[in-house]
Design a protein with these regions (language model features):
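Membrane-embedded beta-strand positions of outer-membrane beta-barrel proteins
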Residues: 50-52, 91, 102, 133, ...
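Residues that define the transmembrane beta-barrel architecture of outer-membrane proteins
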Residues: 44-46, 83-87, 125-129, 154, ...
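Transmembrane beta-strands of outer-membrane beta-barrel pores
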Residues: 54-58, 67, 95-97, 104-110, ...
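Outer-membrane beta-barrel translocator domains and adjoining extracellular loop/strand segments
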Residues: 61-68, 112-118, 145-146, 168-177, ...
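Outer-membrane beta-barrel "beta-signal"
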Residues: 130-133, 230, 265-278
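Gram-negative (and chloroplast) outer-membrane scaffold detector with strong preference
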Residues: 99-113, 117-176, 184-190, 195-197, ...
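Short glycine/proline- and aromatic-enriched beta-strand/turn motifs that initiate or cap beta-hairpins
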Residues: 33-100
Length: 278
């Protein structure tokens, strides 16, 4: 067996820092004297929540392809050096009792290496798409209202859904090229928690487990965010910062027909972004 290191997943971090700084500046009306909670209260029972974000994920684990065992140990700064494109976001539709959501990440990296006087090009694409639904089974009022004019609460919501993952690799050398890919879909079940810590601050956390040998052997997703309610461009907005982990253990026959493709990798790192309510 031969062991090597690979790189795979977010130049966007700098843009994100700038975006977050602009968000803070745009939230100047967040001072108590200027913030109109009644105006911020939703006029409809249904709310659409749009949440762009950046996940500065590092990768740690093992992978196998064509009889080669690969040690996956990629800090985010290495990914950033080879990053071409990163798109990440979440959209949720809820009436407060139940709702649906869509979450997606697409990351593309590229790099060139020298091997035996030949230049080898490696392009890697990773796509993760999740769709799910949730239902609120518990809600406890905590007293007072949020900055958006709604009662402060603690709520718990079971969730169920599907998560699709696709890995693509394009290799080029001496004018020749080859492309290989693998994809799988995992069902998952989990819990979401939302706690209004104060008028402006809130904490959200979510954890789910899936795979069950339907797609991967096992997948675990966990994330938690501290949020601050404010206003951006006239819309109620929550600035968020937190941490996320996604572990996947997937195995299938690879393109050789005699070896296994294995992806036993943990992605983890800080997340920063915002949620705008409509």
């Amino acid at each position: 067996m031969q062991t090597r290191r690979i790189a795979a997943t977010g130049r966007a971090a700098a843009h994100l820092a700038g975006t977050f700084a602009l968000a803070l500046l745009a939230s100047a009306p967040a001072r108590a004297a200027d913030f109109d909670a009644e105006r911020m209260a939703p006029e409809s029972d249904w709310t659409v929540i749009v949440s762009p974000y950046i996940w500065a994920a590092s990768l740690k684990g093992d992978a196998s392809l064509a009889g080669f065992d690969t040690d996956v140990d990629v800090p985010f700064k290495d990914t950033l050096d080879h990053l071409d494109l990163a798109l990440m976001g979440n959209i949720e539709l809820t009436n407060g009792q139940w709702g649906v959501y869509f979450d997606g990440q697409y990351v593309r990296t590229s790099q060139d290496e020298e091997l035996l006087s030949h230049e080898i090009g490696l392009d890697i694409k990773m796509t993760t798409l999740a769709v799910g639904a949730f239902y609120q089974i518990y809600e406890q009022e905590l007293g007072g209202n949020t900055a958006f004019g709604k009662p402060r609460t603690l709520s718990i919501e079971p969730t169920i859904g599907l998560r699709w993952t696709k890995l693509e690799a394009d290799v080029s050398v001496a004018g020749a090229s080859a492309s290989k890919s693998a994809d799988w879909t995992d069902p998952f079940v989990g819990l979401r928690l939302n706690a209004d810590l104060s008028e402006r601050w809130n904490l959200v956390a979510e954890a789910d487990v899936g795979g069950f040998d339907v797609g991967s052997k096992l997948s675990v997703n966990a994330q938690a965010y501290l949020g601050y309610r404010t206003e951006m461009f006239g819309q109620p907005t929550i600035l968020r910062a937190g941490y996320r982990l996604l572990y996947q253990d997937y195995e299938s026959d690879d393109f050789t027909g005699t070896n296994k493709f294995r992806w036993d990798v943990n992605q983890h790192g800080p997340v920063i972004g915002f949620s705008m309510l409509f």
